[in-house]
């Protein structure tokens, strides 16, 4: 049963949890409680992930806070159950965080979690896709942030296409990645450049605190690039568009 999983960090992770969350550890435990109960029931967290909620999810995400400047506005794209955006809001009360999520059942969970954790002053939830948030399409108000975060969303080229327009000029995309980070940078650096991004950099967060450290790819938005225009439809021999 989901409720049988403890929300407190296991003894071997207690020091890391205190280091990353400080005096807001009790708030992190409350969030963990939501994830291993309601999050599992509603299909946002897999049952097998619940016992590993601290090492694979909460600590993994909290370590990224070291890459985010003080007082930043953060847009978390494809937030899902709030990873990493809600974790960052818990760990860093100086941040202003917007959780961007297209699916209704996930946004419903996020809205409830923000209310239960009493984070409404620093966290808002927006239902929509990154492309809509950037352009204001679909009736969604356009938004930008100093930092755009994303976790396990897509390959780097697509991620940059979706997320870089959400960063203010001079802002950055911080994408949580795994062992493929270096290969993705080598493969997609040219595309990132065409999208107005700087050279992607790989960083390892939480070294000496979490094991293994959290790997992120960081891309600065150096230039504003106009979005590509859609190609016109081809005409058939009869003159009709196809």
From Swiss-Prot:
What does the UniProt keyword field contain? Cytoplasm, Methyltransferase, rRNA processing, S-adenosyl-L-methionine, Transferase
* InterPro entries linked to this entry: rRNA_ssu_MeTfrase_G, SAM-dependent_MTases_sf
Question: Which family, according to the similarity comment?
Answer: Belongs to the methyltransferase superfamily. RNA methyltransferase RsmG family.
Single GO cellular component term:
cytosol
Q: Where does S-adenosyl-L-methionine bind?
A: 78, 83, 130-131, 151
Name the major location. cytoplasm
Q: Does the entry feature the keyword S-adenosyl-L-methionine, yes or no? A: yes
Tell me which EC number(s) this protein carries: 2.1.1.-
What is the protein name for this chain? Ribosomal RNA small subunit methyltransferase G
Q: Which organism is it from?
A: Salinispora tropica (strain ATCC BAA-916 / DSM 44818 / JCM 13857 / NBRC 105044 / CNB-440)
One MF term in GO for this entry?
rRNA (guanine-N7-)-methyltransferase activity
Q: What class of enzyme is it?
A: transferase
The record describes the protein's role as: Specifically methylates the N7 position of guanine in position 518 of 16S rRNA.
Task: Specify the taxonomic lineage.
Answer: Bacteria, Bacillati, Actinomycetota, Actinomycetes, Micromonosporales
Q: Where's it found, cell-wise?
A: Cytoplasm
